[in-house]
Amino acid sequence: MATENTPVRIGVLTSGGDAQGMNAAVRAVVRTALRLGAQPYAVMEGWAGAVAGGEGIRPLNWDSVGSILHRGGTIIGTARSKEFRTREGMLSAAANLLEHGIDRLVVIGGDGSLTGTNEFRKAWPSLLAELVETGRITPEVAAAHAQLMIAGLVGSIDNDLVGTDMTIGADSALHRIMEAIDSLSSTAASHQRTFVIEVMGRHCGYLALMSAVAGGCDYVFVPELPPADGWEEDMCNKLQAGRAAGRRDSLVIVAEGAQDREGNRITASDVCDVLEERLGEDARVTILGHVQRGGRPSAYDRWMSTLLGYAAAQEVLRATPESEPHIIGVRHNRIAHLPLMESVENTRAVASYVKAGDYEAAVEARGASFAQMLQIFENMSTPPVQGSHNEASPVKNKRVAILHAGGLAPGMNTAARAAVRLGIDHGLTMLGIEGGFPGLLDGAVKELSWADVEGWVGEGGAALGTHRDYPTIEQLYSIGRALESNHIDGLIVIGGFNAYLGAHTLIKERDRYPAFNIPIVCVPASIDNNLPGSELSIGADTAVNSTVSTLDAIKLSASASKRCFVAEVMGRRCGYLTLMSGLAAGAEKVYLPEHDANLNEIASATSDMVNSFRDGRRLYLVLRNEAACGLYSTKLLADIFAQESNGLYDVRESVIGHVQQGGNPTAFDRLMATRLVTNAMQVLVDELVAGTARGHYVGLVNGEFRDSPLAHMNDELDLVNRRPRDQWWLRLEHVIPVVSQDEVAIDKSKLPPL
């Protein structure tokens, strides 16, 4: 039993279905609790461990959760416990928790697990009274632990909890689905075949809808918006139109909870039968099943779950008996504290909306981005032969060109595809400029049709090409002539810092060159994530995932011996890639250009490293941004660490390099590209309709689309360092020493909440 002299004891458990990223959350809860002076315990196998007691409840130390970030599932096990739902089961769980002095819990699970936890919390006083009455605990123990304090984290690949943007595991599940769709699309195209793919999600259509958009699919069934009567004919017509427009394959996504408006299930087999009967299609069914729960967690499900676990440990340790229970969720990449039962009730209301036929309310409950993606999917997947409604468009036949500039970013092809198809949907004639601004100078301009961008949605690289050069003063006249000779009425520039500088130059020189008086819209695409007006850029998520995959391999290579690895990460003078990769890979130390380290700080870090190896550490991972630490290069840092090791450990360096720009874009980057271009295209069309010619740059800030004037771009920028003045992610830097460096002292009183 706990006494006044023992530390506060908290339990952590995972319950219900497993989800990738649970281990990252468990690790963060345990290590944050230890850093705050508490003693964490693992409740093994979900609530079954609490009911069973004994080895089902185990104390954890720092090393108990080492080297688990990259692992799928949950190392402490999970289960759905029938016994816990009974009064006797709850009595056993309470008695076993109190045997270890635990009256604070962090529970990671779905809405059912969180509801059961809240019922347990509400029953706690009566459970204690009964335990005292039966002599299983003393009155003193009951008085010392009069209330149960809880914090919930949503672990669910379905992403079905209303109020949080993402749940633990949803992004990783999307990774698995996209891997399957990308693989199936190549074999489907080879045979001109149709695939019907069933994805998980229960009664939530998030996975189905987002994978349909990110995978460039033809048709999708989601539970929130059952298809109207006659859906069979509508689907067949759309697939036929896609083939007529140049598609070699057809992909249909079916959510496992899909149904018609009478409440009858629509299965993948039902859809397959319709296609074979009505179109004579050689349709194949692929049910992805539990592969969506498996595999390594994505980078997002590592770094965001780490932040959630960090915040949950703080929340439950701050809680008082009067505190209302909260779910720690995510809104706009920020930690959000949501009333537990209100969130659960709002989630369960979605099913009642669907049952009542109020589909608008069901879609609205899923959030604004869900409704927007439904419309985007309809526009993007509908070939122009079905888009005759645009014959009367006020911008019909206006010529809009797409241009990439700056460094390559995965997702550029996705963005270009979206621009072409959405532009055609608006009635525009879409042009592609090959090779960036130099390509415009050379006249490398061609018209792009709906079919020309088929297959671009998941392709890495840039089919139109990109170039870092942007117009010099001497080239402006030729740029103007190129715009005029190609009759370009508007320009969408997709790229990085140099893309923005080039567009800004055209805006500034309008008085001298009338040809520049066209609407210009910049869309952020850079692995550096250093662009104004947007918290995230296209390509950054893919780059973080590529970096983390490489770091996972590096860590495995170092696990056989005591070793420090110093890895150099790209990003120029912006540390986003370094910090997020450090959080996701479990780096012990990161060096960012925003906070250049001096010799004293490097000496202190070296001393901490030596002490940690003396205490038994086997691996120490240091990440250095390519522009951080001034003259202290990656090699020099490695040499310093090696010199001070005195044979205790060895040191290796690794420059990760351009692998960070490569690979196919992640689902996140595909969706980001599609959303940003949708809004950019609307801004440009509004300019054309109004007859104005302003310059804009678009982005997402606090989850909302933002459109800013290009003429004032420099107000947001630190031009010397080529990055925004305010960078939201820097507020996360303090989390790394809390969850990765037990040898470094921290001031608990100054540990900021997220």
Predicted region positions:
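N-terminal phosphate-binding or glycine-rich loops at protein starts, especially the Walker A/P-loop
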Residues: 2-54, 394-441
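Short glycine-rich or small-residue beta-strand-to-loop segments that form or flank ligand, phosphate
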Residues: 9-17, 74-79, 103-109, 152, ...
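Short, ordered loop/turn segments at secondary-structure junctions
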Residues: 15-18, 43-49, 80-81, 110-112, ...
